[in-house]
A protein has these predicted regions:
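Extracellular calcium-associated, cysteine-rich motifs in secreted modular proteins
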Residues: 1-49
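C-terminal globular interaction/adhesion domains in large, modular proteins
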Residues: 126-145, 149, 153
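Solvent-exposed beta-hairpin/edge-strand motifs
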Residues: 105-130
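A eukaryote-biased signal for long
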Residues: 144-326
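A short beta-turn/strand-edge loop motif at beta-sheet boundaries
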Residues: 40, 59-60, 95-99
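Short N-terminal edge-element motif at the start of the domain
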Residues: 43-82
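Short, well-ordered beta-strand segments enriched in hydrophobic/aromatic residues
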Residues: 70, 83-93
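Low-complexity, serine/threonine/proline/glycine-rich extracellular segments that form mucin-like
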Residues: 64, 96-113
């Protein structure tokens, strides 16, 4: 992702706010407490978080049970510490019969840290929010039930291929967006918020059942998996099957996900090599798709992507300072 460039005084250029960072690279050249913005994945790209919800069993493995788009901005002070985080999400698709929620945890930031936070849906006005109680690390719920957020009832959303929609499928282009803004009382080390952090889904009816990216842990440190007495297929401490397949993936582009009931292995066969090599080979397996197995392979894909990009752009790029209220 893009890292804010800090250039210090002494190179013969103006430093209006006298913070030691010259105006030409100071994104906040009138504020001595702020200096630059990190864009994640980068200033012109939206990332994808995609989840399979059947953990700890593999399920149909179509990897579209919840598909989230994201764009992040970290606001740095002159010492390259993070003063604020601006996290923007949108629901791209939902192919789950289970009702699922979505949350983000910062696994190296203690819940006791001093902060203020707001959460805003669809640019309807920011509302003060607080981190989840009972967590040792800073954790925020973005929403509790994707079905409710999409007004979908029992239907799947944006996962059937064109012309294959059935009575249980919906096409939604007016997608909800969510802005989480966290401002720290004291700036934190940039490594403390290094992506991908710990985004995860949880069962609305059983929030203790969570699905995380590989290498991450349950938000409370341990999962009882109360409705799964045996979970020999996976290790709850690394969220990989015994054969090395994940239940979630962070892809730093607008990824074309498999259509409903299409296995990830069929849509992206190189993932098999990636899994068997423990991630050392086929590291860009998500770019090697198989035609006919993916969602949005028609003109609708263009319209869908255009809507998301325009929506994200209108929210994120509202000015140099406005999104922080500065």
């Amino acid at each position: 992702y893009t890292t804010g460039e800090i250039r210090y005084v002494g190179e013969g250029t103006t430093d209006s706010d006298e913070d030691g960072v010259v105006d030409s690279v100071d994104d906040f050249d009138t504020d001595p407490n702020l200096a630059s913005i990190d864009y994640i994945p980068d200033a012109g790209t939206m990332g994808t978080l995609t989840f399979e919800d059947k953990y700890p069993v593999k399920g149909d493995y179509d990897f579209n049970d919840l598909v989230m788009g994201y764009k992040y901005r970290h606001i740095l002070d002159p010492e390259n510490k993070v003063k604020a985080m601006h996290y923007l999400y949108t629901i791209r698709a939902m192919g789950a019969s289970n009702a699922l929620g979505f949350a983000i945890q910062f696994p190296t930031i203690n819940a006791s840290v001093g902060y203020s936070a707001t959460l805003e849906k669809n640019s309807e006005g920011a509302i003060e929010t607080t981190a989840q109680a009972g967590k040792t690390k800073l954790t925020f719920n973005i929403f509790a039930n994707a079905k409710t957020e999409l007004n979908s009832g029992s239907k799947f959303v944006n996962t059937a291929a064109d012309g294959e929609e059935g009575e249980d499928d919906m096409v939604v282009t007016d997608l909800p967006t969510y802005e989480l803004i966290v401002t720290f009382n004291t700036a934190v080390d940039s490594l403390a918020v290094a992506v991908p952090n710990n985004p995860y889904i949880f069962y609305t009816s059983s929030p203790n059942i969570e699905v995380h990216l590989p290498g991450q842990v349950h938000s409370s440190g341990v999962s009882t998996l109360s409705n799964y007495p045996s979970h020999s297929e996976g290790d709850e401490q690394d969220y990989l099957t015994v054969n090395g397949f994940p239940w979630a993936k962070d892809i730093q582009s607008m990824w074309d996900f498999p259509k409903e009931k299409t296995s990830l292995e069929n849509a992206y066969p190189a993932v098999i090599t990636w899994a068997s090599s423990e991630g050392s080979s086929a590291t860009t397996w998500y770019n090697d798709e198989t035609a006919g197995y993916l969602q949005y392979r028609s003109l609708r894909k263009t319209a869908h992507q255009s809507y998301i990009r325009n929506t994200m752009r209108s929210v994120v790029f509202r000015g140099k300072y406005n999104f922080l209220g500065l």
